[in-house]
């Protein structure tokens, strides 16, 4: 038996062992004589976002009581809007209410309608089960998926137990999507996106929500993961144009210091937005993104640029930029309604100037036409009513995303914080040149921004008419994690000290800030470690609450 056969046999056994642990459930790997895990009630320790706290929460404040009344009054309005969707799907009222916030127990049905999940299920009966079974038998990234699932939303009550029900569903979704869309395969941030949908939707619905989110031209998320996509570069070019017009001093300073694209507020948005702000605000921004589409990305980054303008003009290279990224979080450490008010004003201003979307890409040499790009809404504030469903698997999709920049001469690659690389720009017709990120050993499943850490996450079945969120009786078990300020600064420090990168990965295990127990160590108390060496890359985890919790 040669080396290839031995390696294939080992991987097959490893894959079977991982699948078996999830099938056994959260008690997988424990000795039988330990008995059942003692039940613990979280009635007074779970906040309205589903995060488990070690101490009992204080009584409701007057402001929180006001939020209760507001949530109840909005619930009936959203129910009426869902009942007459054809009337409201393209109305201004839908956008107005999205900026005010969706009630928690309406969010699942509303996301389902916005992403056309029922239509996809009717067009593809039984397809999810087929993809899931194929993924179990042939997944090439199951170790990475298992590792990322173990660190996804671990402070949320739905994902608290290792190998629990929600973790098993999350594994199934990621395995099925890897098989369904081989162009994207698996990227680390997909686990957080899928976990977000699982908090509000059943397993199969969450899978089709992930498919629609990446496939639809309206949201353009596939361009952040596909090696053929151009979403990031198009938005980056448009951001430079908008900032140069509205804030020429800021843009001039960026050009003078030659700050790389990874260090732009767009990059900070991708890496920090969902980890460095309160969960409630993250949810509000996610609602707006699903309703508005990619047009919401530019106003969000523009707000951060405006708030941090003075600090940005004093920034240069990695060290100071790390401090800016840290302060970028403070942009969002404000009242949720205030942030959404400024976001709405920024959206209207950019829409009026037709700066909310990049221009269409020019046709490539030898092609007859370029990929169509959603048009800016001009002075109107209307939501597109026609949300196109993909005709089939992503293999038949048109070229996924545009690139707004004109043809340029080649440039040398520039290393950026966190291990990412600013991609070289080649003239039209030379797209076959290998990516610098791959040349330096970057993961093949991701693209320009190699680290999205998490996405918003919330419970699915809160009843606003019953006891308020703090005292709600959750019947499932799960969790949430967030990125500490030290971890936000770590990528830049490691970029300046490459020799310390591997050493820090082994010397600084992540800990649970509430319990003082490492995530990995706590999981090992519940289950036996996977046999064989781990061939996946290392990554640090942290679980401190972000500001505003």
UniProtKB/Swiss-Prot annotation:
The species this protein was found in: Homo sapiens (Human)
Lineage, uppermost ranks: Eukaryota, Metazoa, Chordata, Craniata, Vertebrata
SUPFAM superfamilies: Ypt/Rab-GAP domain of gyp1p
SMART domains, per the entry: TBC (SM00164)
Bilayer disposition of the protein: Lipid-anchor
Name of the molecule in the record: TBC1 domain family member 3K
Entry comment on modification after translation: Ubiquitinated by a CUL7-based E3 ligase, which leads to proteasomal degradation. Palmitoylation is required for membrane localization and protects TBC1D3 from ubiquitination.
Assigned GO CC terms: plasma membrane
Subcellular location: Cell membrane
Domain Rab-GAP TBC: 101-293
């Amino acid at each position: 038996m040669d080396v290839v056969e031995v390696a294939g046999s080992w991987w097959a056994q490893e894959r079977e062992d991982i699948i078996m642990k999830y099938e056994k459930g959260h008690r997988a790997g424990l000795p039988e004589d330990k008995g059942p895990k003692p039940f613990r009630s979280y009635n007074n320790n779970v906040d309205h976002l589903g995060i488990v706290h070690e101490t009992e929460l204080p009584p409701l404040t007057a402001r929180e009581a006001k939020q209760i009344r507001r949530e109840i009054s909005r619930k009936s309005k959203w129910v009426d809007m869902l009942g007459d969707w054809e009337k409201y799907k393209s109305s201004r009222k839908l956008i107005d209410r999205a900026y005010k916030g969706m009630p928690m127990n309406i969010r699942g049905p509303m996301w389902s309608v916005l992403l056309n999940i029922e239509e996809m299920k009717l067009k593809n009966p039984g397809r999810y089960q087929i993809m899931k079974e194929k993924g179990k038998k042939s997944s090439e990234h199951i170790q990475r998926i298992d590792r990322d699932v173990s660190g996804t939303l671990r402070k949320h009550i739905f994902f608290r137990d290792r190998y629990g029900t929600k973790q098993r569903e999350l594994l199934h979704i990621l395995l099925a999507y890897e098989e369904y869309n081989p162009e994207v395969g698996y990227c680390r941030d997909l686990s957080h996106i899928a976990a977000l949908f699982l908090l509000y939707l059943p397993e199969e619905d969450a899978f089709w929500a992930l498919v629609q989110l990446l496939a639809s031209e309206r949201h353009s998320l596939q361009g952040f993961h596909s090696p053929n996509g151009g979403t990031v570069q198009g938005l980056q070019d448009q951001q430079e144009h908008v900032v140069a017009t509205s804030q020429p001093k800021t843009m001039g300073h960026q050009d003078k210091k030659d700050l790389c694209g990874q260090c732009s507020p767009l990059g900070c948005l991708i890496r920090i937005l969902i980890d460095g702000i309160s969960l409630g605000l993250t949810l509000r921004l996610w609602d707006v993104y699903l309703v508005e589409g990619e047009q919401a990305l530019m106003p969000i980054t523009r707000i951060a640029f405006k708030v941090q303008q003075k600090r940005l003009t004093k920034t240069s290279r990695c060290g100071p930029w790390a401090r800016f990224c840290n302060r970028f979080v403070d942009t969002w450490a404000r009242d949720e309604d205030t942030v959404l008010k400024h976001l709405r004003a920024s959206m209207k201003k950019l829409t009026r100037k037709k700066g909310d979307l990049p221009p269409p890409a020019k046709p490539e040499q030898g092609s007859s036409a370029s990929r169509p790009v959603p048009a800016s809404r001009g002075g109107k504030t209307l939501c597109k009513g026609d949300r196109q469903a993909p005709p089939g698997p992503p293999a038949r999709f048109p070229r996924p995303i545009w690139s707004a920049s004109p043809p340029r001469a080649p440039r040398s690659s520039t290393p950026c914080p966190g291990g990412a690389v600013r991609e070289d720009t080649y003239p039209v017709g030379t797209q076959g040149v290998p990516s610098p990120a791959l040349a330096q050993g970057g993961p093949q499943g991701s693209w320009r921004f190699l680290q999205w850490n998490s996405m918003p996450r919330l419970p699915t079945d809160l009843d606003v008419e019953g006891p308020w969120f703090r005292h709600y009786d959750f019947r499932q078990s799960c969790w949430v994690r967030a990125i500490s300020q030290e971890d936000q600064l770590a990528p830049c420090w490691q970029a300046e000290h490459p020799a310390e990168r591997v050493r820090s990965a082994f010397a600084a295990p992540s800990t649970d800030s509430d319990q003082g127990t490492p995530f990995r160590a706590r999981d090992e108390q519940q289950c036996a470690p996977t046999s064989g060496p781990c061939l996946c890359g290392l990554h640090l985890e942290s679980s401190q609450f972000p500001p505003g919790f």
